[in-house]
């Protein structure tokens, strides 16, 4: 029976037993040379972990299985139930089975204790993607009134090791909600994005923080900086759309013109950048591609020196929009669109030639005068 956050007081099971007495200390080692002392200190630092409160790593040679610990003798472990006839059963390590058998036991008892809290840490070290462990850890954080700033330090280390794990980012989000303090978030996320600027978990968290705490100031400047570093980063173009949509919007003609010209300048830098073309289409499509003043002429001027499949496809979209809006020179516009579809099929986007020929046939079928449609169509 899974525990839920904020349900009840401490469950039966009592407080953990007394820890085992440590063995007598070994005799002092022989004197070390300065270099040896430095190496030993570095090794000690490497073995330490965030929130080091007596936690013993699963990789430690002195690690003791839970089933062999006196303070856990009152708990009957709960094995994983894979059903009567498991297929392709996972072969877990002895440590993994031991930790999760005891985790299932404390979860079943809804035991809100310090030992249960430490157990979640072992379980997370073995599988940080287990959302049930994270959920129960949050239950214990509240029940035991743990220091949430210490927990933030802990989750920072986990995210740095596993930056593309849904559960660790969700845990951080809950902590920020509880603390009502986003002061570390934008800088922390920027550090993660410096390692991988397309980490959508980090972007999702950034969007939530900005929207939840109204941190819109300077975000567009941050986006500009990242686009200068990598104009092809679709995640950053998406962030640009997110920021403007939630602040000024695109209804203001000055904002829209600024964004159109900004995007065209980025396209001039890298003509074959699909991300920029998608952004341009996204901000104009609902307003009518053919209705934006002078856009068609600007793209036609770009075509000789900055031609790409995306530019030609965009021209097809503009011509189609003109046909849909009953332009005066319908036959001429249709012929231009059909010619571009054939250029895409034969030269610029040959891998999708059948798609572009289908688009051409569709345009011809829809917008040709009935007497002009070939019998085969």
Curated annotation (Swiss-Prot):
Magnesium found in the keyword field: yes
Ranges for the PFTA repeats: 112-146, 147-181, 182-214, 215-249, 255-289
Physiological role: Essential subunit of both the farnesyltransferase and the geranylgeranyltransferase complex. Contributes to the transfer of a farnesyl or geranylgeranyl moiety from farnesyl or geranylgeranyl diphosphate to a cysteine at the fourth position from the C-terminus of several proteins having the C-terminal sequence Cys-aliphatic-aliphatic-X. May positively regulate neuromuscular junction development downstream of MUSK via its function in RAC1 prenylation and activation.
One Gene Ontology term from the biological process aspect of the record: peptide pheromone maturation
UniProt modified residues of type N-acetylalanine: 2
Regulation: Activated by the AGRIN-induced phosphorylation which is mediated by MUSK.
Subunit structure: Heterodimer of FNTA and FNTB (farnesyltransferase). Heterodimer of FNTA and PGGT1B (geranylgeranyltransferase).
One GO location term (cellular component): protein farnesyltransferase complex
Keyword 4Fe-4S: no
Superkingdom of origin organism: Eukaryota
One Pfam match: PPTA
Composition-biased stretches (Low complexity): 41-51
Protein name per UniProt: Protein farnesyltransferase/geranylgeranyltransferase type-1 subunit alpha
Known cofactor(s): Mg(2+)
Family according to the record: Belongs to the protein prenyltransferase subunit alpha family.
Biological source species: Rattus norvegicus
Organismal lineage: Eukaryota, Metazoa, Chordata, Craniata, Vertebrata
UniProt feature, compositional bias: Pro residues: 19-32
């Amino acid at each position: 029976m899974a525990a839920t956050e904020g349900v009840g007081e401490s469950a039966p099971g009592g407080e953990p037993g007394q820890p085992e007495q440590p063995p007598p200390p070994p005799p002092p080692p022989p004197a070390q040379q300065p270099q040896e002392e430095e190496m030993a200190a570095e090794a000690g630092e490497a073995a330490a972990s965030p929130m080091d409160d007596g936690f013993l790593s699963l990789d430690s040679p002195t690690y003791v299985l839970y089933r062999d610990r006196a303070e856990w003798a009152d708990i009957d472990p709960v094995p994983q139930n894979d059903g009567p006839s498991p297929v392709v059963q996972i072969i877990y390590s002895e440590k993994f089975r031991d930790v999760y058998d005891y985790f299932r036991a404390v979860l079943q008892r809804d035991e809100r204790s310090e030992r249960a809290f430490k157990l979640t840490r072992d379980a997370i070290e073995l599988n940080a993607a287990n959302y049930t462990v994270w959920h129960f850890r949050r239950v214990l954080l509240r029940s035991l009134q743990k220091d949430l700033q210490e927990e933030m330090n802990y989750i920072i280390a986990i995210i740095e090791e596993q930056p593309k794990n849904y559960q660790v980012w969700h845990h951080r989000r809950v902590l920020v909600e509880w603390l009502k303090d986003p002061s570390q978030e934008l800088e922390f996320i920027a550090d993660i994005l410096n390692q991988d600027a397309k980490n959508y978990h980090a972007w999702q968290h950034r969007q939530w923080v900005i929207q939840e705490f109204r941190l819109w100031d300077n975000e567009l400047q941050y986006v500009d900086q990242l686009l200068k570093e990598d104009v092809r980063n679709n995640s950053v173009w998406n962030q640009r759309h997110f920021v403007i949509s939630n602040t000024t919007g695109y209804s203001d003609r000055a904002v829209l013109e600024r964004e159109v010209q900004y995007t065209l300048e980025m396209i001039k830098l890298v003509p074959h950048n699909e991300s920029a073309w998608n952004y341009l289409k996204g901000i104009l499509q609902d307003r009518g591609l053919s209705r934006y003043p002078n856009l068609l002429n600007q793209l036609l001027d770009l075509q000789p020196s900055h031609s790409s499949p995306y530019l030609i496809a965009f021209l097809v979209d503009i011509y189609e929009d003109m046909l849909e809006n009953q332009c005066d020179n319908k036959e001429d516009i249709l012929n231009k669109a059909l010619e571009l579809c054939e250029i895409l099929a034969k030269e610029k986007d040959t891998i999708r030639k059948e798609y572009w020929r289908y688009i051409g046939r569709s345009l011809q079928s829809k917008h040709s005068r009935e007497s002009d449609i070939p019998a085969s169509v």
